[in-house]
Amino acid sequence: MSLMTKLGFRALVASCLITAGSAANAQVNVLITGVGSTQFPIATANFTNEANLPQQITSIVRADLARSGKFTNIDAGSTPVPETASVDLGAWKAKGANAFVAGSVNRDANGQYKVNFILYDTVKQQSLGGLSLTATDTTLRTAGHKIADYIYQKLLGVRGVFATRLSYVIKTGNRYQLQISDSDGQNARIALSSTEPIISPAWSPSGTKVAYVSFERKKPIVYIHDLPTGRRYMVSDQKGNNSAPAWSPDSNTLAVALSLTGNTQIYTVNANGGGLRRLTQSSSIDTEPFYSPDGRWIYFTSDRGGAPQIYRMPAQGESAGAAQRVTFTGSYNTSPRVSPDGKLLAYISRTGGGFKLYVQDLQTGAANAITNTNRDESPSFAANGQYLLYATQSGGRNVLAAVPSDGSAPPQILSVQGGSVREPSWGPFMQ
């Protein structure tokens, strides 16, 4: 969420933070370009039998690799090449491709698609294996993303995030929509539509649920939405405000910020809505909890030192150990997010009258701004830790942007066809 001169928790200001857009349907297009100084050249031939499919597998694979900023697509021509073909790898190397992909799509008697592909290293003149996937008309895109993930991991040694999903809130006219999309912003589905603000979406570690805060009952209440079934249920409707849900790594618990006794404090609640337990015991404002990936710590924002800073405490609460301050660069830091490997902390820092996304090495304490935008908020790591998604402003609009988490390239604004978009959350690896 956005930031205030006096730190408060996010639910109170949601209605003034989310601005109106003009389009009835908004589409987010995710692009990350120019990552690093070297891009891997790869040629992906058209898969056989895909010309009349509702989704072109090779188009999805090529687009995924290109938007990652890590690959350059070499023209593979228009002739389909199946995975069973004998391939002249030397010829593809001569064309500038260090890797080559061939594949096929075949429909079986049940109407399902069998998608097969093989990846070659043209430099070492060897196969790097492949996958055999089953898909339907509605999951062909997912199959394409999984192929791109396989290629990314085999060639770069890091697990790809193309088959992950995003959640975000779009406001068009007077209506708010919590949308779930593929990692490229395509295939967006509406999880919730409301005339009242929706904020703070947070993915469960399994990727099957999203917790969020809705104002539909004229106050902030925490809900969980089960994506496979479409069922949703209330988790926290305590006296006062209920805000900032964050999942524990085992999915059993949510940390939340509640003003149950006055000042906002951090609590935990079971994912079924029971077992409320207070964790912080300060006279200050404690908010924006976030679990470390090993579940040992909860990072949070507090003004207990006189100005907002990031602290961490044992996941059992301050009764198990005193909270420790984590951020020391800058006088105003909020919105902590820990990378999936537990090594980096992303947060928002007020600098020069604006707000920038910073990344801090949790071992050394070194912190650096990684964006050139100036109204940053709501950072969210990709599941592989390689990228950060965040909300910012560009051209007077609320937009999303993506940036490498090491700051190796400038952020890229994500294209939205109308509307105001914010509150991004990047989902985990699919189980």
From Swiss-Prot:
Keywords: Cell cycle, Cell division, Periplasm, Signal. InterPro entries: 6-blade_b-propeller_TolB-like (IPR011042), PD40 (IPR011659), Tol-Pal_TolB (IPR014167), TolB_N (IPR007195). Transmembrane segments: none annotated. Pfam families: PD40, TolB_N. Residues 1-26 form the signal peptide. The keyword Cell cycle applies. One of its GO terms (cellular component) is periplasmic space. It is found in: Periplasm. Part of the Tol-Pal system, which plays a role in outer membrane invagination during cell division and is important for maintaining outer membrane integrity. HAMAP family: TolB (MF_00671). Belongs to the TolB family. The Tol-Pal system is composed of five core proteins: the inner membrane proteins TolA, TolQ and TolR, the periplasmic protein TolB and the outer membrane protein Pal. They form a network linking the inner and outer membranes and the peptidoglycan layer. This is Tol-Pal system protein TolB. It comes from Burkholderia orbicola (strain MC0-3).
